[in-house]
Structure formats: structure tokens, C-alpha cells
From Swiss-Prot:
Protein name, as recorded: Chaperone protein HscA homolog
Taxonomy, superkingdom: Bacteria
Molecular-function GO terms, alphabetical: ATP binding; ATP hydrolysis activity; ATP-dependent protein folding chaperone; unfolded protein binding
SUPFAM superfamilies: Actin-like ATPase domain (SSF53067), Heat shock protein 70kD (HSP70), C-terminal subdomain (SSF100934), Heat shock protein 70kD (HSP70), peptide-binding domain (SSF100920)
Length: 622
């Protein structure tokens, strides 16, 4: 009798069983959707044959809305109700975005993420992004002829937990099942790696409309391993537009604050066209009339533009150096540099990348499309449509360390930065005081040694710990980061089994430069941080020793004569005074002096306990 053959899950070859999944590049300036068709990834066009969907949503008074090209065409005439570059606001609070360069919107002060007032009511960045995602979903279903089982949506590698969660929420609102949030540079590497069968060390330089990412990847026989990631979640092509915008106004003697919102949007649109023209011409002309009758006519050379944006170009190289340092490689070790994002079409970017890495960048895939193509490949795999050439493994990383606060305001790192995800790490902690029945778990993110210098992500409490002496309880704290880069934390007391957990969902994310600043500060202040940590550890141990000694004196002080008691009291007082200073060595010495001075007392207490335990018992009972 022949054995029945059962396919591995997801390996069924029948074409009618193929599950439809797409990759979506939710961009700051433009968004795209791609799918694998006939084993080849391709970007899906709209009815007019356009693959790029401008990431623009216009809200109308009657509750209607315009999305994409139609909305973009009206941005200059109705700027307050036409939301552009909404990705910059994802996971951000009002205080973080109110200074957004030349933004014509009325921001609303609401709990958590920023809100924008429109004629159709107050809208959140999640709602605006959902409109864009829903449009792409509809395009995909119309093109592919069926409903989608899910989507892989790309995000900047440097998006923090709040920004990632906001992206998932937008997808859910758009009716999309998120198979995975995939880092944009990694998606690009998938597209390049599978297309070219590449191996070796690669850098992915991703400059989009609103974000910058630099990832170092190692490609080896189908394994995509991210060695390090860096970036700036508030740097992109929009900033180059604003630099040129400010220059044009300065030349005309105008102030942006005095312009009507529609003039700001009109001028930004014209400046963007000017910037794009300078990518292929030595100079370009600007000719525009504002609503107040002011006429601006200027000619800008490429050299002038290059000078204006040089500080922005250098800002991309700072995280590039950090990522190389984290990966422990040099520019000479890099086999190829992949350019991603429409902003990398600028000659100033390509020249800077070529100069830094000592080689021309790879540009054989469209930088606007490469991320969506890689996401489509990953989506097809996650949907179960595996083929013979799909035996590859993706290993992504987290950009910043995750830790927990311990006594004295110290940070104990649980998962270090650039750890491969998904990942789970656990560590055991204990109680500080006798009879302690609860423990506060404070989850932090950053590279510094003190909690005050790191970003607070979440707090929760583990209650119901059985009363025990200090140090007897065993609390196991587990950090778990899923494949989307989202964090969950679990705490469990090992003896009783009592447990608590939290899914980290901060109300909004890190400020524009916080992540880069965290890393930069950690490098600059490493020695100072370690000294501060040593001091706090010494102070915590001194406090523990004082409390333990005082508890022992209260319980068994009669075991000491007056001279012995006075000596111990003197050492306790000395330690308490010294512990208030900033000399860790002196504190450790005073702590040791108290420990040495109470050795005999501890021995007498032990004898007393043994005698009490044996009192009234026969020898054969022992």
C-alpha cells in the first residue's frame, strides 16, 4: 500500500490554493503596494497605470475625502484640510510636532498622539494613514481579483514602539491583517538579495520623504542577518525641500510666518519640483505668484543647492558611522551600498555615499519601488506560498537596548541593542526589604546606566508576593520582542506562581532626535555612567546593610554588652554619613567595616537560633 503524502503547511502546490498577500510601503511622500505574481514581485498600478500613490488625504465638509493624486492637486488651495507627510506625526505627541517646519495644520491637544482639526472633524495620524492603506488594499484586491489574507507593511528601522503600534492600528482600521511589520532597509535587502543572489556585507542607505535609516546586513546563503541599524526618524527629503524653501524666501526678503497657508503649500510644491529638476540639470528656475500678488522669480544652481543641504547630508553620515561601529566593520568591508527612497536620486546624496564608502552605490532597482518589492516577497512567504527557492531566513534587530529599573535608579539591560528579533530574554530579581509583598516593574529603553537618562516605556506592579526575608523571593522578569519589534514584559514570582504582564504601548514615541541622542550620549558618557552606577550600587548595598543590622539589633540586641552595642552603632552612623557622599570606594570600605564589626554578633544570633530549635528535643529526634 502506498504511503499518503501530506504537504508541509503552506507548501500545497495547487494554484487555486494560493493565498493572496501584499507588501505595502507606507511612505512619507508616496506609498506603494506590491505582490508576487507568477513567482515575480511587481508593484501594482492604479487604473491610470500609476504605481506611486501620493501619501496625501484631503477631508471635505460633507464627510467625503480625496486620497492620493486628487488630494495632492488640491494641497495648495486647501492646505488646512489636506494632510501630507502624515508619517512624520505617527506615534508623536502634540508637543513634538507643533514645531514642524511650515506645517499649516491646527494641531489639537489630546491625550496621547497628536490630532489635526479638519472641516470633517478632528483626525489622528492613524486615521489618515488608514485612508491611504485602505486605498492600497482596494487597489490590490481589484488587481488580484480576490480578498487579501494579509499584508507586510514596512516601517523605518528606527521607528520606536509607539510608531510601530500606530502603524499596526492604522492597518487594522483599514481592514488589513498585518502579517509582519518589516524594517524598510531589510525589505530592500530581500529584494536585492533574492534578485541578485548576493552574498557578503551590504549597507542599505534609506532616505525617504521623512525618515532616514542605515542598516548593515550580512547576506549568506539565503540568510539575511541585520548586524546593526541606525538612523534618524525625523530626517528625510522633506527637510531638503524646507531648506530650499527657506533659501527662496530669504532671497525674496519674505518671512514664512507672514504667508497664507495656501501660499506655503504652493511654494513647497514648486520648491519640490525645483529640487527634482536640479537632480538632472546644473540649474533650474522658479517662477511663482503668491496670493498677495508677490512674484518670486529665481534661478538656483545645483552648487547653491548642494551648499544649502550639506548639513542634512552630514546628518545622514552620523548614524551611518555608528551603525558601522556597532557592526564592527569599516566602509572598506562593505561589498555594496543599496540606495532606497526617492530622495536618494539627488546627486548630492549619491556623491556623498560614493565618497564615504569608496564605491558607487547600487541603483539597478528603482529606489521608490525596492522596499515594496521586498515586502511583497516576505508577504508571499508568510502567507504560505513557498516555492523551491524560498529557503531563506530573515534576522532583524532592535535599535535600542531594553532594560528594567533596579534599586537606586539603576538600569539592568535585559535585551541589548542590535539583538536579533524575535527574541525573549529573562532575568531573576529579588526583594529589597523583609516582608515585601509587591514589586514595581519599570520598563526603560536606552543605553545609559541610570534610569533618569533613559526613556520610560511602561510601568506595572507584581502583587501578591508571599512575605519573606529580603532576598528570598525569586521574581523572573521576561522581556519578549516579537517579529514586528513590539515588546511585552512578564513578571512571575517563582515560589507562589503569582504573575503580571504588560504589552508596552506608550502613548506616543520618542522625540525627533531622542534615539540618536541616546546613543550619542551613551558613547560620550560611558565612563561617567559607570562611575555613577558604581556609586549607586555601593549606596544601595550600604542601605541594605544598615537596614539588616538595625533589624538584628531590634530582635537580639540583648546579646551585646554596652561597649559592643556602642561600637556597632558607631559603625552604622559612620556608614550612613559616608553613604551620602559620592566616593564609592569609601562607601564600600565603610560597608565592609560594618560587616566585619557585626560578625561576632551574627555568630551569637546563629547560636541562639540553633539552641531555640533544639530546646526540649531528644537526641534521637535530631
Amino acid at each position: 500500500m502506498a504511503l499518503l503524502q501530506i504537504s508541509e503547511p503552506g507548501m500545497a502546490p495547487a494554484p487555486h490554493q494560493r493565498r493572496l498577500a501584499v507588501g505595502i510601503d507606507l511612505g512619507t511622500t508616496n506609498s506603494l503596494v506590491a505582490a508576487v505574481r507568477n513567482s515575480v514581485p511587481e508593484v501594482l498600478p492604479d487604473d491610470a497605470g500609476r504605481v506611486l500613490l501620493p501619501s496625501v488625504v484631503r477631508y471635505l465638509e460633507n464627510g467625503g475625502r480625496r486620497i492620493g493624486h486628487d488630494a495632492k492637486a488640491q494641497a495648495a488651495t486647501d492646505p488646512r484640510n489636506t494632510i501630507v507627510s502624515v508619517k512624520r506625526f505617527m506615534g508623536r505627541g502634540k508637543a513634538e510636532v507643533e514645531g514642524a517646519a511650515n506645517a499649516p495644520y491646527e494641531f489639537v491637544d489630546a491625550p496621547g498622539m497628536v490630532q489635526i482639526r479638519t472641516v470633517d472633524g478632528v483626525k489622528s495620524p492613524v486615521e489618515v494613514s488608514a485612508e491611504i492603506l485602505a486605498t492600497l488594499r482596494q487597489r490590490a484586491e481589484d488587481t488580484l481579483g480576490d480578498e487579501l489574507v494579509g499584508a507586510v507593511i514596512t516601517v523605518p528601522a528606527y521607528f520606536d514602539d509607539a510608531q510601530r503600534q500606530a502603524t499596526k492600528d492604522a492597518a487594522r482600521l483599514a481592514g488589513l491583517n498585518v502579517l509582519r511589520l518589516l524594517n524598510e532597509p531589510t525589505a530592500a535587502a530581500i529584494a536585492y538579495g533574492l534578485d541578485n543572489a548576493a552574498e557578503g556585507l551590504y549597507a542599505v542607505y534609506d532616505l525617504g520623504g521623512g525618515t532616514f535609516d542605515l542598516s548593515i546586513l550580512k547576506l549568506t546563503k539565503g540568510v539575511f542577518e541585520v548586524l546593526a541599524a541606525g538612523g534618524d526618524s525625523a530626517l528625510g527629503g522633506d527637510d531638503f525641500d524646507h531648506a530650499l524653501f527657506d533659501h527662496v524666501l530669504a532671497q525674496a526678503g519674505l518671512d514664512a510666518k507672514t504667508l497664507a497657508p495656501e501660499d506655503v503649500r504652493l511654494l513647497l510644491d514648486r520648491v519640490r519640483v525645483l529640487k527634482e529638476a536640479l537632480s538632472s540639470a546644473p540649474e533650474a528656475a522658479l517662477d511663482v505668484t503668491l496670493s498677495n500678488g508677490a512674484h518670486l522669480a529665481q534661478t538656483i544652481s545645483h552648487d547653491t543647492f548642494a551648499t544649502l543641504v550639506e548639513p542634512l547630508v552630514q546628518r545622514t553620515l552620523t548614524p551611518t558611522r555608528k551603525a558601522l561601529r556597532d557592526a564592527q566593520v569599516t566602509p572598506a568591508d562593505i561589498k555594496g551600498v543599496v540606495l532606497v527612497g526617492g530622495a536618494t536620486r539627488m546627486p548630492v546624496i549619491r556623491e556623498a555615499v560614493a565618497k564615504y564608502f569608496g564605491q558607487p552605490p547600487l541603483v539597478n532597482l528603482d529606489p521608490d519601488q525596492v522596499v515594496a518589492l521586498g515586502a511583497a516577497i516576505q508577504a508571499d512567504l508568510l502567507a504560505g506560498n513557498r516555492g523551491s527557492g524560498d529557503d531563506w531566513l530573515l534576522l532583524d534587530v532592535i535599535p535600542l537596548s531594553l532594560g528594567v529599573e533596579t534599586m537606586g535608579g539603576l538600569v539592568e539591560k535585559i535585551i541589548p541593542r542590535n539583538s536579533t528579533i524575535p527574541i525573549a530574554r529573562a532575568q531573576e530579581f529579588t526583594t529589597f526589604k523583609d516582608g515585601q509583598t509587591a514589586m514595581a516593574i519599570h520598563v526603560v529603553q536606552g543605553e545609559r546606566e541610570l534610569v533618569a537618562d533613559c526613556r520610560s516605556l511602561a510601568r506595572f506592579e507584581l502583587r501578591g508576593i508571599p512575605p519573606m526575608t529580603a532576598g528570598a523571593a525569586r521574581i523572573r522578569v521576561t522581556y519578549q520582542v516579537d517579529a514586528d519589534g513590539l515588546l511585552s514584559v512578564f513578571a512571575r514570582e517563582q515560589h507562589s506562581g503569582v504573575e503580571a504582564s504588560v504589552v508596552v504601548k506608550p502613548s506616543y514615541g520618542l522625540a525627533d532626535d531622542d534615539i540618536a541622542k541616546m546613543l550619542e550620549d551613551s558613547f560620550k558618557t560611558a565612563e561617567v555612567d559607570m562611575r555613577a552606577r558604581a556609586l549607586r550600587e555601593a549606596q544601595v548595598e550600604a542601605e541594605r546593610m544598615i537596614e539588616a543590622t538595625q533589624a538584628a539589633l531590634a530582635a537580639d540586641g540583648e546579646l551585646l554588652d554596652a561597649v559592643e552595642r556602642a561600637e556597632i552603632d558607631a559603625r552604622v552612623a559612620a556608614l550612613r554619613t559616608i553613604a551620602q557622599g559620592d566616593d564609592a570606594d569609601a562607601i564600600e570600605a565603610a560597608t565592609k567595616a560594618l560587616a566585619d564589626g557585626t560578625d561576632e554578633f551574627a555568630a551569637r544570633r546563629m547560636d541562639k537560633s540553633i539552641k531555640r530549635a533544639l530546646s526540649g528535643r531528644r537526641l534521637d529526634e535530631i
